[in-house]
C-alpha cells in the first residue's frame, strides 16, 4: 500500500476496547489526486506519528505515477529487470514487491484500531470484503486466497489472477498503508517483477475482464463499501473531485 502486497507488519500493541459508550468518529475521506508515492508515504507516516487519541480516522484515495514498492523484509531479487525505468521505493509495510501506476486505485486506511475495537485480522477481512463487493457491483466474481492477502479472479480465462493487493503497517495501535485495485492500467510493469514475491503470478485489471469502468466511479463504490464495512457510518465531508486518469 502501499498500497501494497501480501502481508501485515505490526508493532506489538495491546488492542483494548474504547471506553464504554464512547462514539467512534466518522471517517474523513480525502481525495488526494495524482500524487508521487513518496509524498503519500511521508504524509501517512507523519499523520500516524502525530495523531492523538482524539485524532479522527481518515481514508486517503490516490493515484500514483509508476513506482515499485518493496516491503521492509522484501527480497530485491523479485525485481527481475533492474533498468526498467520505474523507480523502486523501500517501505515499512509487510510483503514483497508490487507495482503502482496510473489507472490503479490506491486507498490508504489511517485508522485507530484500539478505538474501533478492531483486531488486525478483522480489519483485513473487512477490507477484502469491500473489494469483493465492489467487483461484484461490476459483475466480477472474486475470491480470497488463504495465506495470501489480496483479491483474485474467481473463474474464467484469468482464474487465479490477482486484481487487488493489500498491505498494512500497524504502529501504536493505528493502521496505515492499505490496498490497491487495478481498474484500467498498463500491466506490463508487473512482468518485470514477481508480484508479491510469487513467480509467474498473473496480474489483471478490470479492463482485462471486459469491464469498461470509470476510475472515479469504481473509487467511490470502493470507498462506500469500505466505510459501510468498517462501521456503517457516513464519511465526514471532504468533497471528492474527479481525477485525471492517464491511459499510459
Curated annotation (Swiss-Prot):
Keywords: Acyltransferase, Cytoplasm, Transferase
Gene3D superfamilies for this protein: Bira Bifunctional Protein, Domain 2 (3.30.930.10)
Pathway assigned in UniProt: Protein modification; protein lipoylation via endogenous pathway; protein N(6)-(lipoyl)lysine from octanoyl-[acyl-carrier-protein]: step 1/2
Any single Gene Ontology cellular-component annotation: cytoplasm
Domain of life: Bacteria
Localization: Cytoplasm
GO biological process: protein modification process
Sequence positions that bind substrate: 93-100, 165-167, 178-180
Assigned EC number: 2.3.1.181
Domain BPL/LPL catalytic, first and last residues per copy: 53-238
Protein family per UniProt: Belongs to the LipB family.
Protein name: Octanoyltransferase
Lineage: Bacteria, Pseudomonadati, Pseudomonadota, Betaproteobacteria, Burkholderiales
